[in-house]
Amino acid sequence: MKKATLGALIAGAVIGLGISYVTAVLVDVTGKPEFCASCHTMKPMVESFHNSVHGGNNPQGFAVHHCTDCHLPKKSLMGYLVAKGISGTQDALAEFGLIKKVDFKENYWEMKHYVYDSACLQCHHMVKEPEKALSMSESSRFAHKYYWTQKKKGADISCVSCHNDYTMPHFAHPGLLDKLREE
């Protein structure tokens, strides 16, 4: 192999790795609550998240680290990246007034469109087989069996159909709806 060809291959590999690294860092940084809170419209969401079970306000002190852990689909890397690009672009355009901002107060109960079951199931995988989840109460096992039965029938049901701030005030964004009403 000629030195020029070998040099071009090595340079291409180094450039490719560099681009991959920068992309991975940007994907990580732009999913963190601090980044999301840099936009005025997301501040109430980030504040309420930090007071939630998922934000670390739990006996274990465990916290979900990125807004995108819950608010982007997790079925495939490509689907995740495409959704992140679309969502981020829409958020940025709305923040700068180029498109209409999402009315979070008006769309609060449409959360099934921006909280993904695939994200919930990454951590709460035991609900996939509720009959085997001995740590769950009997009523919780029953409810999750119902969820899976309905899902198989094609019902429009999601984790947040039941798990939301109204039914579980300590959930992901406690007091968010009240805070949005104040604005």
What label would you give each PLM region?
Residues K2-E183:
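Short sequence/structural segments immediately N-terminal
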